[in-house]
């Protein structure tokens, strides 16, 4: 169990060939890394855990598990479980071939590129999260976020910066947006629980679109449903000059309904 003195936030780079990664950020002055085989009875997993490299120098943490070219139907890829405890506000970069990535606590910028697996981020200064197959969930992001998945859903609970979200097949949900949002999916619903300011560009080919606008915010609408209904449930407000904030909404769906409401 490697342990390093880290009185300040670190820059962590993790390369995982197969298995799960859990990053936990807290107010602490050290960094602890634990690596275990996913299956302690698998010789391949045990060997992969033993060969996983953990290095630290000058504020930079490097964790790298061995890559094996073996095909899944010939026994599968060796798998490890990595648990990292580090100082809050640390920067995290992850590259993963197969496995879930879970980040807890308050982090700096977080960048995750995965082929297969879910991505969960508790709180970050900024987010880049992409997976080919899996869900992306962000509880809170203080800055901008870019998230995408080919097959899976995307959910952001609160964003203070701008969002760019895209999925080929899956729903996109933002509970509260304080900045602009661009959200596109081919097959799925797009839902913004509450928009405060900025612009919303919401598009889906097959699915409903819903946008909630905070009380006191004026809204400019440009919406169209090719085969569906458009419902504007906004309560009247004064002109834009009287509103606290303004949001511009452009919503499109080929097959589905569009609902714009107060939130």
Where are these regions (language model features)?
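Intrinsically disordered, low-complexity terminal regions
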Residues: 1-263
């Amino acid at each position: 169990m490697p342990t390093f003195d880290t009185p300040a936030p670190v820059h962590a780079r993790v390369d995982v060939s197969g298995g799960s990664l859990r990053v936990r950020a807290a107010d602490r002055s050290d960094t602890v890394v634990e690596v275990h085989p996913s299956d302690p009875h698998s010789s391949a997993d045990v060997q992969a855990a033993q060969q996983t490299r953990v290095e630290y120098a000058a504020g930079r943490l490097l964790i790298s598990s061995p890559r094996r070219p073996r095909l899944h139907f010939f026994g599968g890829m060796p798998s490890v479980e990595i648990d990292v405890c580090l100082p809050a506000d640390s920067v995290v970069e992850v590259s993963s071939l197969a496995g879930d990535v879970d980040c807890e606590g308050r982090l700096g910028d977080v960048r995750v590129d995965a082929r297969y697996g879910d991505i969960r981020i508790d709180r970050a200064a900024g987010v880049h999260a992409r997976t080919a197959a899996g869900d992306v969930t962000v509880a809170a992001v203080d800055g901008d976020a870019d998230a995408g998945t080919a097959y899976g859903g995307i959910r952001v609970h609160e964003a203070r910066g701008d969002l760019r979200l895209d999925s080929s097949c899956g729903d996109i949900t933002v509970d509260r947006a304080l900045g602009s949002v661009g959200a596109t999916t081919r097959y799925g619903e797009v839902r913004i629980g509450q928009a405060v300011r900025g612009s919303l560009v919401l598009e889906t080919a097959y699915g409903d679109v819903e946008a909630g606008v905070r009380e006191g915010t004026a809204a400019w609408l440009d919406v169209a449903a090719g085969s569906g209904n458009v419902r504007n449930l906004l309560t009247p407000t004064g002109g834009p000059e009287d509103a606290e904030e303004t949001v511009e909404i452009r919503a499109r769906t080929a097959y589905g309904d569009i609902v714009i409401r107060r939130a």
